[in-house]
Amino acid sequence: MLVYYGGSALSVQSKKKILELTVSGVSDLNAVYFYLIYTKSNSSLNCESLRPILSDLQESEFKPDGTTMVYVFPRPGTISPWSSKATNIANVCGYKDVIRIERGIAYSVVFKDDISEEMLKSALNHLYDRMTEALRFKLPEEDEVFDKHEPAPLVRIELNCGQGGDKQAATERLNHANKKFGLALAPDEIDYLVECYTSEPSLKSREPTDVELFMFGQVNSEHCRHKIFNADWTIDGEKKDYSLFKMIRNTHLKNPQYTISAYSDNAAVFEGNSGTLFAPVNGIWSMKDEPVEFLGKVETHNHPTAVSPFPGAATGSGGEIRDEGAVGQGSLSKAGLAGYSVSDLNIPGYKQPWELDVGKPYHIATSLDIMLEAPIGSSAFNNEFGRPCINGYFRTFCMEVPRGDGTLEIRGYHKPIMAAGGIGRIRKQHAFKKSIAPGSPIIVLGGPALLVGLGGGAASSMNAGEGSEELDFASVQRGNPEMQRRAQMVIDACTTMDENIIQSIHDVGAGGVSNALPELVHDAGLGARFELRDIPCIEPSMSPMQIWCCESQERYVLSVKSEDLDTFKSICERERCPYGVVGYSTVEQRLILTDRLYNTTPIDLPMEVLFGKPPKMSRVAETQTIPLSKFDSSLKSYLAPSSDPILDAVERVLRMPAVASKSFLITIGDRSVTGLIARDQMVGPWQVPVADVGVTVTSYGKGINTGEALAMGEKPISALVSAAASARMAVAECIMNLVAASIPALDRIRLSANWMAAPSHPGEGAKLYEAVQAIGLELCPSLGISIPVGKDSMSMSMKWNEDGREKSVTAPLSLIITGFSPVDDLYSIWTPQLRKVEDIGSTSLIFIDLANGKQRLGGSILAQSYKQLGDEVPDLDNLDTFKNFINVITQLHKTNYIQAYHDKSDGGLFVTLSEMAFAGHVGIECELDSLSSDNIAALFNEELGAVIQVCDRDIAKVLELFAANGLSTCVHRIGKVLSGQAQTISFSRSGKIIFKSTRSKLHGIWHETSYKMQEIRDNPECARQEMENIADNNDPGLGYHLTFDPNVSVTADLALTSRPKVAILREQGVNGYLEMAYAFYASGFTAVDVHMTDILSGRVHLDDFVGIAACGGFSYGDVLGSGNGWATSILLHEDARNEFYRFFNERKDTFGLGICNGCQLFSRLKSLIPGAKSWPMFTFNESAQYEGRAVMLKIDETSGSKSIFTESMAGSSLPVVVAHGEGRAVFDSESDYEQFKKEGLDLIYYVNNYNERTSRYPFNPNGSRDAIAGVRSPCGRFLAMMPHPERVVLKVANSYYPHSKASEWGVHGPWIRLFQSARKWVG
């Protein structure tokens, strides 16, 4: 094993954070990476020879005097995602002697002299993640990192229950195994297993293996089998006719139309719109008209996120993406969402008056840590895989609530909710799994087995604190999204064939292949014979049980016909995606797993034992009535007499995380990848995160103006008062959000219902039944909508001992509703952005009150902010009123009367109107005379309703439409938008102002929570600058200042008789190929799919192309530096290097475009690009965070005229999207910078909204020197840029464009010109 130290592992910000967290025990620290390179025994590799891939290697030792050395490295027995990718790079780059590379961090720590043992332990805990890392005071030994132990053998569990053995003793032994392995088996299931091993002829002659028992525990866990939802219920002594699941299925039974597949697969499939399949056919990107069906799914990953937030949330999103990719014969995730519920944040120095700190179990993360780390984990997976995340929610809650006996208990989210969901697309002919032919090869596709995620299905089925700490840690997985992207590329290659070779596919999730492989063949009515050692596995010491049951991520199981196996293998090899043919299906319905290494049979079971009918669960529940107090809407009971009640309420409500800006959760995510996003969370010229709905475009294709919408709704605090009302309001809120998009009709909406509960907690089982009944048997059938998909998590409580006292926190019943619908007009997506008087004339604000004057405050944000629950909560009281409102809204979408729309929800009418003003940077004046005389109740109740902005000239028509639908009494003309720059927000009654402030002040308060989180997590200076920008009333926002007419095609006057070939170049991990291919395809090129394996193998030569386009994404997961692995694989491969050298240097008819990861590639290939020696490298953003934003770019007037891409765009400035973590332009030397400026290679740069070159964040999102965003070669034929023009080629894909351009620009926006210009140059 070679050991070398590397560069600094601590940024200024991260060092500061650690010192702040360890202030009581540490006075100083520094850190560098250290690399452990495991090589073949006779290898001659050394520091110098490894530097091309590990550029920061140092031969000297890192051990400063007077410090204590602390070494952090991946947990023994595990392989980090970093190691997998780094080793992959080394092998691709020709380092055949490298077996594995691992990386750790060496800290040199100066501890304070008086540090106690407890302080030392606390300080060390801040240096590593116990779930994924180990800590030592010396460098790890080779055997500790590079496990060379012999494989562990099979274990048999001695039940002694066969041949007339004692069943009671066997039951006791199995109970012991149940606790030891964390199987979460119920007593009746233990009895069932004992009976099976007693009476089943093929089993009673032997003892069960640990593999069999562990598999049974996973397959039959609550997580996988949903026992509570399938149980028989008796409530208050009355036996119920329906199971919970039967009530949910009732919605589909009553309304099956428009749903293609429900309850039978990893996601539900819905009828979509007409569109196209745009995909490579024999390598050529081609477009084919066909229906585009879409699918929906929402998962939760609560337990892992509580234990270790980053990997827990990352694998939550990753698992849900796999669900969407493994429907029928194969599918594809298209856009995602993420939601979080946690207890109070308790931000240091920013504690809010409603917050509680009741402690937590030692090994569970705090709510603050969860919200600092989990969203990064989820976003990182989405970003790297290449799925835009365009919707979500965030709620905090922790409160003392009375029990039925009047004593108090804590209700909150110590067991957090981490929701991950989304929509995908599927070809109609692939919506159902095909029958698997007997004898078909069964394949595991994706990453290898790893010693992670053991028992996750069972662990998540237990209330937190019931299992052991070590079992909790063992049950959490780790994510490798770049591997999952490779697997998805294999699936895509199969599904775009005329005849898909995949017969059936399942994702590997809870229980690992022990659940997925049996399920795959069982669904087909078959058995199977598997060989354990054919399952890809890179940790040799793993036992049979660990290989079979581990939840290693990024895996799928599938079947193909024998005659298609070679084709499938060739696809995998092209994509460098691991796979294993692990067995074959059999007619006999028996599951057999052999182990040729030990010549054993770890599993030999009839399928009916595994999937048979263990005893059905029966649940008995009692209704619990708790004493409730009416909320004092005057607030006098909660405030000092001198307080201003409305001002106090405003400031509390705007700071509540459920209301406050979610910017810190949004800009960390890529919301533009694919180029098919028509509506993300950020709204308008000032990009304020207030959108109600996320919308995707159906597909690329001429004239396509349709899409798919998704939105969420949840009202969990109300469930503490009325579970039925909470459920109805969650459905209603979701629909109110969804109709901001133009949906065809109410009956096209389909829902996912995700149920979180602690049904064993007093009263909670009855509440769960009440809520399911309210929407399953009553509301949804009445609305004509259904719930064809969903999930449940039935262990939402946390228990622990602290100082000898037992503590517990139990979540309220939490129903998360996600709605999905086709969209029939992408140009009629309403946002909350109020339009300015100067742009459209005088307007009115109309409030539609669907509660007909009721103003119940129970369960509201206002009540929570005063630590109150209330006694009466909002409800959907009048179904006809609600349906008529939706009918009016769908009709209004066919007009141009509505200028802005926002539903009323968390925070009430005050928040609805304020957010609309924030988004529009306008002032508003509102009058409450037509509402209840209780001002606070009128402003902060959360009854159903919405606000619309209507031009005064259109008011009569809009009011007439509401009247025609019986809604006249619901409509209130309550305000107007003010002209000018004053931007005041005021509310009055009877001519007297009851509240007045400024947009900038309220906007600042609303953004404060996000700012505080960014200040802790990211570069605090960047967070401060973004906060300060809010106060600028004169900020004109994003704008289009064009020197060209987008309607005029620069190729129109050319006689284009051919489509020259452009290589759409990608490497493993690249995810931005679709939008790049379309941009060139739409501009008159033949776009050709070229993987680096095509070039390295010699199958493809660049001589055949006039252009290359290196796409964005995460080649090799950005390990060893963004673009570095990709570039090094070219530079160190003689044939590939020559291919690129010839393309760049020996031909004058070529051009090249590198975007994002492709830009980073070009900058590292600058030695091959003529005149590019002075180009900068692109490194970590100054914000220390991934940045997904819409920003302003300017094309330099002089330099722009010298580039073939921008000659007709020179001098223009316009918005574009950025999506990168490493985009800051840094020069190798000052002389390079001077040469670069002298030659005028600075082509594109960031400007602020005043059209000025800027270093200020977030206008310059990465801190690039001179705001550099894109560079050109001296000849003008090669362009490298970090922003993504290809993602906003479609006009509707721009997060903001002027309303006046909706019809003027046609299908494409201004950035199509960049690609058309290349086509013009080719001629």
Curated annotation (Swiss-Prot):
The molecular function GO annotations come to: ATP binding; metal ion binding; phosphoribosylformylglycinamidine synthase activity
Residues binding ATP: 312-323, 391-393, 691, 905
Q: Which GO terms describe its cellular component?
A: cytoplasm; Golgi apparatus; vacuolar membrane
| UniProt: Mg(2+) binding residues | D692, E733, N737, D903
Q: What's the main place this protein lives?
A: cytoplasm
Q: What is its EC number?
A: 6.3.5.3
- What keywords were assigned to this record? ATP-binding, Cytoplasm, Glutamine amidotransferase, Ligase, Magnesium, Metal-binding, Nucleotide-binding, Purine biosynthesis
What SUPFAM superfamilies does UniProt report for this protein, alphabetically? Class I glutamine amidotransferase-like (SSF52317), FGAM synthase PurL, linker domain (SSF109736), PurM C-terminal domain-like (SSF56042), PurM N-terminal domain-like (SSF55326), PurS-like (SSF82697)
Q: Where are the transmembrane segments?
A: none
Q: In which pathway does it act?
A: Purine metabolism; IMP biosynthesis via de novo pathway; 5-amino-1-(5-phospho-D-ribosyl)imidazole from N(2)-formyl-N(1)-(5-phospho-D-ribosyl)glycinamide: step 1/2
Where does the record place the Glutamine amidotransferase type-1 domain? 1062-1306
> Known InterPro entries for this protein?
Class_I_gatase-like (IPR029062), FGAR-AT_N (IPR040707), FGAR-AT_PurM_N-like (IPR055181), PurL_large (IPR010073), PurL_linker (IPR041609), PurM-like_C_dom (IPR010918), PurM-like_C_sf (IPR036676), PurM-like_N_sf (IPR036921)
In its keyword annotation, does this UniProt entry include ATP-binding?
Answer: yes
Compartments, as annotated in UniProt: Cytoplasm
- Reaction catalysis annotation: N(2)-formyl-N(1)-(5-phospho-beta-D-ribosyl)glycinamide + L-glutamine + ATP + H2O = 2-formamido-N(1)-(5-O-phospho-beta-D-ribosyl)acetamidine + L-glutamate + ADP + phosphate + H(+)
| A GO biological-process term | 'de novo' IMP biosynthetic process
Residues at the catalytic site: C1156, H1284, E1286
Superkingdom is Eukaryota
Q: What does this protein do?
A: Phosphoribosylformylglycinamidine synthase involved in the purines biosynthetic pathway. Catalyzes the ATP-dependent conversion of formylglycinamide ribonucleotide (FGAR) and glutamine to yield formylglycinamidine ribonucleotide (FGAM) and glutamate.
**HAMAP family found in the cross-reference section:** PurL_1
NCBIfam families on file: FGAM_synt, PRK05297.1
Q: Which family does it belong to?
A: In the N-terminal section; belongs to the FGAMS family.
Protein's name according to its UniProt entry: Phosphoribosylformylglycinamidine synthase
Q: Please name the gene that encodes this protein.
A: ade3
